[in-house]
Every structure is written in structure tokens, then in C-alpha cells.
């Protein structure tokens, strides 16, 4: 991971005060110019002060090779700027025009079978194509030269959602780039052979030229897991290398103008190593779309907290989310009433100083015409636009009250997330396909919240070991360095929760031998010899295990065969004799150095974890940490605590009444009176303390 760039935030227009940014993607080229003035009128009404422009406008800006038309974009930016609306200007390189792909079909990426992915949607370019790079960098150069010194442009939006559709390319360009990547990482082909375990299945290589991408190998076969893991690393790096090239061209011509690109961080997405990418942007930005159903709010808060972790608690930018339904799910559920304000304020609570949507005006044609927007098809007279205006007013009040300059207050608890562990657990020849990394951190975040504890979600490379309490949930890969950090954290007094599927392999997906969890067995005080996966695909096979604490394990359990003398069993299995699991330990507490650990050797899910947490916390001497799980409380404060804010969200589907402190400065579906707040479902109250 490279050294992090110094954080730099888009500055207000000349003469304007620093405020929370608010707006969305704006596509004036998709509408007649007579609509633009009405757009600006509605933006002013809603409190919009920034829009992202030109993201998919390459074909409009360069309609023919070498011929540029900036006139329409100049007029749009000028109108916006004179109305006090700043512009986050795109490099416009996200989707190449047809003339380019017709002239150079070699820029199109290939799938694992070698088939060309043709134009017709977006992101049909291959990241490693030198031809595409030449054209993209030329456009960046033209954009930067034309808009250098423009008073209304406050940031660069480089490309868009790198890897959303072209994450994996299997072309010969990609093959050559992968060979170079391996040579840089491993230096010798023998080191590659060792890392990939090529002695298995006669895969030994004599030269870097023998390395090929993980192309199609036939149905029902298994790709080398080390190679597959490295290809995911390479693919993230290849896209990052292109981003850096675009960024550097823009920066060389417009120094001092902050640059970003929009990530896709959620509880269900790990396209790229966004923690690694976070080091290469001036400010971190994210596109997040809510998960319909009972996890909606918790997942929003979880993903926002992870963004705060990726940003290392510097202000970050919510670049895209939706006012209601998206267009790309089999069933595109509408958002619950009130969630426009609630979800956005959850992101603000977790450190976002900018709230933007896709998109400003809902399209009347194209693939995303059914994707909700700030101005829906129904127009100004609609509940969505009224909610958009309410949110704008709330963000304005928070700015007036001094929220800018505050950061999310550090929790006592860190839930650790690791992109590479997710990539490794996606492999199809693992002990079970019912378990991977990314589901467990969200379960822990929600279970902690059920016990009134708001955790920080942080990347494994971050300072998780500076917290009082840390959770390693299915962190499958533990390198020697991370294992050392674990050992030192607990020995020095840290409190650590570790789950099944943690520490099984090193960074090359080589198993830590001697019993699981490999490199930290002594820290957690257990030794696992075998696993007991569970499912319902085979009649009569083990499909669940009851615990004697009243919870139930599904999908996966460790067969813990021995525990340390320093350990205490907090829960065991109650199972029929034939299973071999009766009275086998399931949850084990241990002392190590000056610290304490709890090992959870099975998948309990959110509800099982929530029920087990009081006893687990008690074993660590942390019983007083729990609070009211009906609400999620998040605080923001500045370094001197002169400005201190508390956000209180209703997590339930019923009204809740709770004690609060301070002056209510924003409330949605909530009422505050004499230190008591009544908050309806999807409601939130913000207090200045």
C-alpha cells in the first residue's frame, strides 16, 4: 500500500462560506437547454450547492476524433456557477464513444472465455489497453487545459466507478500486464511457484511468459486459488494504475484542485481494494445504494462507518445514493418514507461532509430511466422532491450550527473488514460456499447495535489495534505481520473477539498448519482439528446445532478439540450423539498477557450474536458497555470539543422514546421535549451538546 496523499477538500466558491456540500450527478447534455434554467431554480429551492457534471459526456465533448465541443458544457457550468452552485467536473473518460471503439476494437475487454465485450452499455474498455489509455489521457489533458482556472470548478471527478463492469479482463493486454505485475511482486518465477503452490496438479512454470490470466478452464473445475487471489489483486491495481495516470495528468495542469473517484463500498461489495485506493485520492468518495428490507438502515450505517475508516476519519464525500428505487435489481423496491433524510444524516453522522445523489433529474430514456432521482418523473410536486428540500434545509442548519470541522467520535469497538479475505473466501473449493468474509462483519455491527453499542468499521490495514475492543470476523487471511499485531494487541491489554474462519491461511492462501486458527491459536486458547459445515442440500445431513445458551448455529461450526488452561467455555453444543458435536465447546473466553479474548467457533448470525454478547462482554469485564439497542447513537465533535453533536436514529419499526441531551437542531419524524425524544420509524434527531 502506498503512502497516503494529504487530505484535500473541495473549497467553496469565492465569497461563499464553507458548508456541507449537497447535490447530485447533473447531466445537462441529456436535456434541452430550456430545461436548464428550471433545473437551477429547483436546485436553489432544494438547497443544492454542488453538482457533478460530464461523467458520461465523452461522445458529446469529443463527437469525432480530435474535434472538441466545450460550448454546451461552458454554458452549463457558467449558469450553475453564477447561481452559486459549484461543479465537481468529471474527466468524462468513463465510457468511450463509438467512433473510438470502431476504430480501435482492441480497447474492448474480453471475458474469461475470450469473447469480446461489445459497446452497448458502459465500461467496455480494458484497463490495461495502451490505446485506450492514450485516448483517455488526451481527453484528461484537453479537459484540464480548457477548465484550468475556472472559478466554478472545485474538484475533479476522475472517471466513474472503476471496475463496476470491467473489473476482470482476460485479454492479451491483461496477460502481459499480469506478467509484469507478478514480476514486480515476486521478482523470480520460483517465488511465484511457491506463492501459488504450483507443485499441485503439475502447474510449475519456468518463465514469467508462461503466466496467463485465470481464463475459462471448463465447468466443474477449480482454478489455482493463489493465482485467482493474485488476479483479483492485480485487477484492482491495474484499474488503480489507470486512475493514477488520469489523476496525474489533471493534477499537472490544475495543481491544487482536489481529485477523487467514486468507490462502491457497501456490506455486499468488494470490487476493488478500496482501502488501498483510499491512499491515492485527495478525498474519499462513495456510491452506496441501500439494501431493501429489515437490514436497510443498519447496512447504510455500516457502510458509512467503513467509509469513515477508509478515510481515516477525514471528511468523505457521499457521491451517489438513491432517493428511492434503483433500476438494476430483479425487484426495485422503493425506499421507506423518511429514509431520504435518515439515510443521508446517517452518512453525515459517520463523517460525510457531502451528500449527493444519482441523479438530479430522472431520465426519460435510457437504461436508468427507472432509477429514482432528486427530481422524479412526477416533478416538483412530489414527495421525493419535498424530502429532498427537507434534507437540504437540515444540511443547511447543521452547517450553520458548526458541524463542519467536526469528525465522527472514535468508538471503543472496532469491527475489522478485509477485502483480500473476502476475495479468498469467494473461492469455490473452500470448506463451504455458505460462508464468506463480508457477511460476518455486518452481523457483528448489527449485534453490537442491538446491545446499544455503535462500533467503528475499519480496514485491516488501519489502526484497529488502537481501540479498546476489536472484532476479527471471518478474517480468513492473517499474514505474519497481522498475526503479530493481534498478539501484541491482546498481550498489551486489548479485548479481542475472534470468529470461526479467521486466521486459516496466510496472505498467499497457504494454510497455517498445526490446527486452526493457525497463527493465533495460543491467543484465543483453542485448537480446531476439523470443521463441521452445515446445510440442507443433503437429506439427513447436519443442518444446525443448538447451543446451551439458547442460540442456534447454522452453516458452519469448528470442531474445537482442546482449550487452553487459561480458558473458560461460555457455551457448548447440545447435539445428538451421532453428530459428534455434543458438549463440544462453541464459545470460549481466554486470557492472554494483559488482555482477554472470546472465540466464537460457529456462525450464530446477528440474532445469535446479539443474544450471546452480554455474557461475552461480561467475560471481558465490559458489562457496562451495553445500552439501548432500539436506537443508534453517533457523535461528531471537533478536537477541542467546542462543537459536539449527537445523532440518534430509530432502528425499529415502532416509535421509540429515549433520553437525550442538548438542543435539537434537526429532527425528521421526531419530536424533542424536555430531554425526551420520541422518534418514529425511519426518524432521526440531531442534537448539539
From Swiss-Prot:
Active-site feature positions: 161 (proton donor), 320 (nucleophile)
GO cellular component: beta-galactosidase complex
Any one of the GO BP annotations: galactose metabolic process
Gene3D superfamilies: 3.40.50.880, Glycosidases, Golgi alpha-mannosidase II
Binding site for substrate: 122, 160, 328, 368-371
Keyword Nucleotide-binding attributed: no
One GO MF term attached to the UniProt entry: beta-galactosidase activity
PANTHER family: BETA-GALACTOSIDASE GANA
Protein name per UniProt: Beta-galactosidase BbgII
Organism lineage: Bacteria, Bacillati, Actinomycetota, Actinomycetes, Bifidobacteriales
The gene coding this protein: bbgII
